Amino acid sequence: HQPADLSDSLRERIRVAATDVLKALGIRCGLAHLELKIINNDLYFIEVGARGGGDHIADTLTVNSTDFDYFKAAIDACLGRYEHRDVHNVAYTGIYFHCKENSSLQPIFEKAKTADWCICNTVKDNTFSEAFSNVETANSGYIIYKYKEKITVNNI
């Protein structure tokens, strides 16, 4: 979900650590996707890739939650023309995968069928199947939302 619910100090720690990781790997220009876990306020990078984010992070979530043209920036970076600018959040976006682990979110999936905040819905039926990988969760369907706040069972 974007934006992440993080304190300003934690967000800054992540920015500094991510910059340090990219510099250490020699990634100076272009796309980069970093995944991290925060455990007991410690940062653990679990994936770093010189590519855009998957699971609709780049093509849908970032484009809809910020005033940042992700694809223009990617092209400009590849051509050596990218100029840094501040990015502002303009909405909340998120993706919920329709799998057994998310069966408690059934009210969200039901409401998404007719809600204006649902910008993509690939859920085919009400069966919540077990998912052991991204492929299985994508195959079982998902919804993507864009709204003034994070969509939860409590605010639909």
Q: Can you say where each PLM-predicted feature lies in the sequence?
A:
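Internal nucleotide-binding/catalytic subdomain
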Residues: 1-43
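Glycine-rich beta-alpha junction loops
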Residues: 4, 38, 49-52, 99-102
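Short, structured loop/turn "capping" segments at alpha-beta junctions
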Residues: 28-30, 69, 83-88
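Short coil/turn motifs at secondary-structure junctions
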Residues: 41, 53-55, 148
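Pre-DFG segment of protein kinase catalytic domains
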Residues: 45-47
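Glycine-rich phosphate/pyrophosphate-binding beta-alpha loops
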Residues: 49-65, 123-129
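C-terminal catalytic subdomain
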Residues: 62-75
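Peripheral (often C-terminal) accessory segments that flank ATP-dependent C-N-forming ligase machineries
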Residues: 75-156
